[in-house]
From Swiss-Prot:
SUPFAM superfamilies xrefs: Ribosome recycling factor, RRF
Gene expressing this chain: frr
UniProt cross-references to Gene3D superfamilies, sorted A to Z: 3.30.1360.40, Ribosome-recycling factor
Protein name per the record: Ribosome-recycling factor
Keyword Transferase: no
Keyword Protein biosynthesis: yes
GO cellular component terms, A-Z: cytoplasm
Native source organism of the sequence: Mycoplasma mobile (strain ATCC 43663 / 163K / NCTC 11711) (Mesomycoplasma mobile)
């Protein structure tokens, strides 16, 4: 098989791992309100799961607050229920027609806990990328159409991609850690 066949598949899967990691770390609050924290949170609306961002206007009126204004006021209770199920360090205030989320300022101890959580997510993202490499390497080694030289070339190319995507993970990690530790 052609090198592009292998590399395109690897790029796609590794990019997916980086994107998943990026989404996960976006949900780690650095003491500042970030609308990404509530992206993807669903609640039931007329027996259908709906995401908050589909059913409400979301804004950040202050550095440590998110304001959710549902398009249909009847959904306020459902939104609050779904937010309560999330394990975020925030105060949920029902203001009738809207919901205000208040985030406390982070203590040094809490920042360190979040960095530990970040390290775990970082490691699992790297493991996912290495797993893609390992699976692809097995396929390359099983490909009987490839000569030894071609196999070595393909394996080297897969390793270069692995290094590139692990570097991306590390860059995201550095940025997030810096954000968490900035007071």
């Amino acid at each position: 098989m052609e090198l592009n066949f292998y590399t395109n598949k690897v790029k796609l899967e590794m990019e997916k791992a980086v994107q998943t990691y990026s989404n996960q770390i976006a949900k780690i609050s650095a003491g500042k309100a970030n609308p990404k924290l509530i992206s993807g949170i669903k609640f039931i609306y007329y027996d259908e799961p709906m995401s908050i961002e589909e059913m409400a206007a979301i804004s950040v009126p202050e550095a440590q607050q998110i304001l959710i204004k549902p398009y249909d006021i009847k959904t306020t209770k459902n939104i609050i229920e779904s937010l309560n199920k999330m394990n975020y360090d925030m105060q949920i205030v029902d203001e009738g027609a809207q919901v205000r989320l208040k985030f406390p300022a982070l203590t040094t101890e809490r920042r360190k806990e979040l960095v530990k959580q970040l390290v775990k997510l970082n490691e699992s993202a790297k493991v996912a990328i290495r797993q893609v490499r390992q699976d692809e390497n097995k396929l390359i080694k099983k490909d009987e159409e490839l000569s030894e030289d071609e196999q070595k070339k393909y394996l080297d190319e897969i390793q270069k991609l692995t290094d590139k995507y692990i570097f991306k993970i590390e860059e995201l990690n550095k940025d997030k850690e810096k954000e968490l530790m900035t007071i």
